Amino acid sequence: MSKTTVIAIFMVVLVLGLVTKETQGQELCHDYMSGTELCEEDKCVAKCIWMHGTAAKGTCMPKPSKQCVCTYSCNA
């Protein structure tokens, strides 16, 4: 094989490997928490960050609701 063909095959394998690595780390988990009082957005966000780290996102279910939903990386 010529040098150009070998380099082209190497680049294809490298790019495919990087794409596969990127898509594997994007799995998200959800944690549904119910309370006794109506959900408040800032408290929901703070609780999610406390439980799952700074990358977690918290949001209240459609209002009025007593449920908070945390979304975070499953790998964390």
Curated annotation (Swiss-Prot):
Q: What is its main location?
A: secreted
Taxonomically, which superkingdom?
Eukaryota
Signal peptide residue numbers: 1-25
Instruction: Say yes or no: keyword Coiled coil present.
Output: no
Q: Has UniProt tagged this entry with the keyword Secreted?
A: yes
- Give me the disulphide-bonded residues: C29-C74, C39-C60, C44-C68, C48-C70
Which UniProt key words apply to this protein? Antimicrobial, Disulfide bond, Fungicide, Plant defense, Secreted, Signal
Task: Cite the record's tissue specificity text.
Answer: Expressed in flower buds, but not in stems, roots or rosette leaves.
A GO CC term assigned to this protein in UniProt: extracellular region
Which InterPro entries did the record assign?
A: DEFL (IPR010851)
Task: Give the UniProt family note.
Answer: Belongs to the DEFL family.
UniProt name for this protein: Defensin-like protein 122
